[in-house]
């Protein structure tokens, strides 16, 4: 397991990262076709250049485990900032450390995610570090978290959810509808691929368009593809929304289950960490994610099956859920919706019922194709 330890007490150092494997994350901001605000550049560089702990005899109260991408680090720092603001003892220098852990999904970039196989491609190594006591809490993008957690861990906290919509980014077109027939769109998401091809069958999708946000924008600027779709939540957290050409509505592109949500896990027997995390939990987000994951669990979805699901609170305070399954080529798309009270019991039932309906409608073999 590859881990790199940083202190998170300082967030203002502009020096280059000491880890050579992270150099891409700073250099990839230099292409001219896309914009990054000065604040964003400073924040990302600071995220990657956090100072080494200066007091060797000081033991961190919390070690945060995370992936090493700029977005993952932004999420880890958001978690750190909220912990520091909520608990005075955590605001002291050296009280919180960030540990970067390289996952299977980070190591294998030459294949589509669906071809790698298995679940937890971006979480397994971090969860193992948590179970082994190498870290105290694990910060995950909830869309990457398998529906079944390791027995030794719990996930008691979801931070407030960001915008769930997808962003369209292109140098030559204002929207998907404006792309000429045969245009190539880059995405590593089967969910996006299937919905794009369902609505715009004349387009071509390159489905091994992988890498962090900066890498994908660089590939786009180099002309590898004509357009790409990225989660708006990630662009907002990186302060890179100036690169967005247009934003797709929920009707045009139903988001991934738990898109835009951050989940924080700890060991199931660590009452202190559970208490810290409970103080950060955003209950409305937690309920929505629970509903969506109940839907996903019922479908037993994997990286090979395009699945989308979104639970939100409507103007009357009710839960409105929309779910979708599709064939990878977009020729078959099945959708459903539910409405009910915004309570844990009802929302879990909504997700489960919606999943069972689509399982029945899809028929045998649909999820194995």
Swiss-Prot record:
Keyword Chaperone: no
Keywords carried by this UniProt record: Chlorophyll biosynthesis, Chloroplast, Plastid, Porphyrin biosynthesis, Transferase, Transit peptide
One of the GO BP terms on file: protoporphyrinogen IX biosynthetic process
Pathway given in the UniProt record: Porphyrin-containing compound metabolism; protoporphyrin-IX biosynthesis; coproporphyrinogen-III from 5-aminolevulinate: step 2/4; Porphyrin-containing compound metabolism; chlorophyll biosynthesis
List of residues that carry S-(dipyrrolylmethanemethyl)cysteine: 303
Span of the transit peptide along the chain: 1-46
Enzyme class: transferase
InterPro entries: HemC, Porphobilin_deaminase_cofac_BS, Porphobilin_deaminase_N, Porphobilinogen_deaminase_C, Porphobilinogen_deaminase_C_sf
Pfam families according to UniProt: Porphobil_deam (PF01379), Porphobil_deamC (PF03900)
UniProt cofactor note: Binds 1 dipyrromethane group covalently.
Cofactor(s) named in the record: dipyrromethane
Predominant location category: plastid
PANTHER family, sorted: PORPHOBILINOGEN DEAMINASE
Extra facts: The porphobilinogen subunits are added to the dipyrromethane group.
Full protein name: Porphobilinogen deaminase, chloroplastic
Organism: Pisum sativum
